[in-house]
């Protein structure tokens, strides 16, 4: 099976899954369209509320899309498919790359849907700002992709929904996806150590300085550099490649 064929197969699996359709696409889109019309003229985090909440809901849906490959990995493990792959011509690297690319493709679809809704509800950015915000969001998803792969190879298929749900919802909530919980003090300092904070605030970063400050890049990089080796170790342990 060629790499592109396997990516296509994984993408179809993702898009046929009702959890992906609901959590990555429907939920953030519906919440955005319900909340924003009544708050079109509000200001949050120094930017128009429609822009802030568009970025927040796009980040929330994209987090689900990024971590979702873990669910497919867990299902494959429960059926013995992960170990069976070792005796097929499909290389392990191809399998992992397909999962990662699928995560990002689903995330891009989420961003496109929320961008369209935002534009229809008054969000106005120039082309460079749209691209810059998209770039920040995709970079910020790296820890979630790694977390999904790690959880998929470690947690049982029955326990995985709770594990993934707790991880995404907690980080999204603390990061400000459903409204800023902390605007000052020690708690704000703590939540700035989460990658979800910088995902949610990608819009205000683009409108302000055009990018995250150094602190944001460091936080996302540290999370990615910590979770990626864990994902690799989980995969090797699960498949017997130790």
Residue map of PLM features:
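Short hydrophobic, aromatic-rich alpha-helical segments embedded in or entering the lipid bilayer
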Residues: 1-8, 177-217
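Short alpha-helical transmembrane interface motifs in multi-pass membrane proteins
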Residues: 20, 51, 62-67, 97-99, ...
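N-terminal Sec/SRP start-transfer signal
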Residues: 1-21
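Alpha-helical transmembrane segments of multi-pass membrane transporters/translocases
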Residues: 34-36, 201-242
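Transmembrane helix segments
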Residues: 34-41, 152-193, 197
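Hydrophobic alpha-helical transmembrane segments of multi-pass membrane transport/permease proteins
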Residues: 15-41, 49-68, 109-110, 163-173, ...
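Alpha-helical transmembrane segments and their short interhelical loops
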Residues: 92-166, 170, 213-221, 228-229
